[in-house]
Design a protein with these regions (language model features):
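Bacterial N-terminal signal peptides that target proteins for export
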Residues: 2-15
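Hydrophobic helical h-region of N-terminal Sec-dependent signal peptides
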Residues: 15-22
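Residue-level signal for mature regions of secreted extracellular proteins and peptides
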Residues: 21, 33-34, 110
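C-terminal motif of bacterial Sec signal peptides marking the signal peptidase cleavage site
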Residues: 24-27
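Bacterial signal peptide processing site
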Residues: 29-31
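Post-signal peptide N-terminal segment of mature Sec-exported envelope proteins
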Residues: 36-58
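Extracytosolic low-complexity repeat regions of secreted or lipid-anchored proteins
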Residues: 49-50, 68-129
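Amphipathic alpha-helical segments
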Residues: 56-67
């Protein structure tokens, strides 16, 4: 009887350890997703700054170069946003907005991307009105 109790204790301890490892791994996944989303938002922020500079550039050539660099930064943000979404579906809106950047002019995406990144960097998943 004592051997059976000891065996059950070992099995219970092993199951508890497995559950703890699984919970820890899933928490790490969400942390990694947040980190990837923040990486994407840093690129997005840089892109928006370049885009706004392109609007007031002194020459057409400078404006075109800045706009192209801004577009390139938006596309570079797609990788981290995709990885964030793969780990945590709550970042899907960010990834989807970035995917639209190849079809929609940046001027129409700026506000949406800024708000989504505001949520990424906040401590709550909601924005105050």
């Amino acid at each position: 009887m004592a051997r059976l109790t000891t065996r059950r204790s070992r099995i219970g301890a092993a199951l508890l350890a497995s559950a703890a490892i699984a919970c820890g791994a899933s928490a790490c996944g969400n942390g990694a997703a947040l980190s990837e989303a923040r990486t994407a938002c840093v690129k997005i922020d840089h892109s928006i700054k370049l885009y706004k500079q392109s609007l007031v550039a002194p020459t057409l050539a400078a404006a075109s170069a800045l706009a192209a660099h801004a577009q390139s930064d938006l596309l570079a943000a797609l990788g981290p946003a995709s990885r964030a979404t793969s780990s945590d579906g709550s970042f899907n809106a960010l990834m989807t907005s970035l995917q639209e950047s190849s079809r929609v002019p940046e001027q129409y995406l700026v506000e949406s991307l800024q708000r989504q990144c505001q949520v990424v960097f906040s401590s709550t998943p909601y924005l105050a009105s």
